[in-house]
């Protein structure tokens, strides 16, 4: 079965009670102000069709979903051995901002989708790009076909004011020789990436390349190679949802990436990308209603990569 507006609308109504069950991220003050009852879903097919329900057009802070975009940019700038010598490909099983594992593993982050891994990727972008923050913004605008997408400067400033732990992660990696630039400028870029403000529709369109062997459905241009697309989806399936990746694979069965802003993107390779948003989170930092919505959609349209 194909996804339809009626299917999405029925799922939204079914999962709506969960919006009052989770907890909105409060360690970033600007995120804590987002109403917990927001709920949206968008599907973007490889034929270019957009199907939506709920608050799918409303922009929100994409947070860690941006880590996939940073990795995609880095894949185009570095040879695989260069890239993967500085960050691993394994699930962490720890909190996304853990220092303990990083210390034990001598400054090499487990994967690019936890904070340490994404900060290393931003360090790598800083080494190869003259203006990485502007390049990322142009990249997202191009992939989505939406030139008005921007950074939420209030969120970025809020994160920078509460950046002690991420700074500690960066300095710890630098002490092991796995950080090559000044810490503060790299953190500024990292927080701006997290503060990208996008809607479910914009996210689903942006990540269409992961459902289409590395080619953007929006632009028709090759973003990454088919092999890199497959590898990225493999990492999303194993590492994309913090320490809830196994639960998500079990329930939803799609490569995915979440953010503490309540967004999740999911990929059905060869067919479609899906974006959901509901700010109330579970204990792993993943959207409670969003995960359930994706689980129901996967069941109703009969899709899973497994």
UniProtKB/Swiss-Prot annotation:
Keywords: Hydrolase. Substrate binds at residues 64, 115, 159, 166, 190, 242, 260. The keyword 4Fe-4S does not apply. GO terms for biological process: glutamate biosynthetic process; glutamine catabolic process. It comes from the Bacteria. It catalyses: L-glutamine + H2O = L-glutamate + NH4(+). It is an enzyme of class 3 (hydrolase). SUPFAM superfamilies: beta-lactamase/transpeptidase-like. Its EC number is 3.5.1.2. It holds the Pfam family Glutaminase. Coiled coil: none annotated. GO terms for molecular function: glutaminase activity. Gene3D superfamilies: DD-peptidase/beta-lactamase superfamily (3.40.710.10). Homotetramer. Belongs to the glutaminase family. This is Glutaminase. It comes from Vibrio cholerae serotype O1 (strain ATCC 39315 / El Tor Inaba N16961). The lineage of its organism: Bacteria, Pseudomonadati, Pseudomonadota, Gammaproteobacteria, Vibrionales.
